[in-house]
Amino acid sequence: MMVCLPDWLFLLFIFSILLQSGTNFYGTFQSGSISRQLSSLSSSIDQLFLKVQQVVYTRYPSRDRVSDPRRRRGLSSIPEGSEEATEV
């Protein structure tokens, strides 16, 4: 079974193959500088994340330090024997 392919589609297919091979060759040729750029970008993103984290924690410093009586009531709500001694 023969499939008729238009000329423009065939040329587009050939052009995409050439573009992909050229991109792969350029990426292999420039891999050193690309990896350096990616590592510098990664480190700058890490620094930005740390700065944002510091800003968030300085704006809400009491969020972690708040002693919620409902949370701390777990085992500490049971008296240690002071009531038992007074029930005589």
Curated annotation (Swiss-Prot):
Record InterPro entries: MP_R3
Superkingdom to which the source organism belongs: Viruses
UniProt-listed GO biological process terms: transport of virus in host, cell to cell
Sequence segments annotated as region (Disordered): 63-88
Pfam families on file: Curto_V3
The entry's keywords: Transport, Viral movement protein
Role this protein plays: Probably involved in the viral transport within, and between cells.
UniProt name for this protein: Movement protein
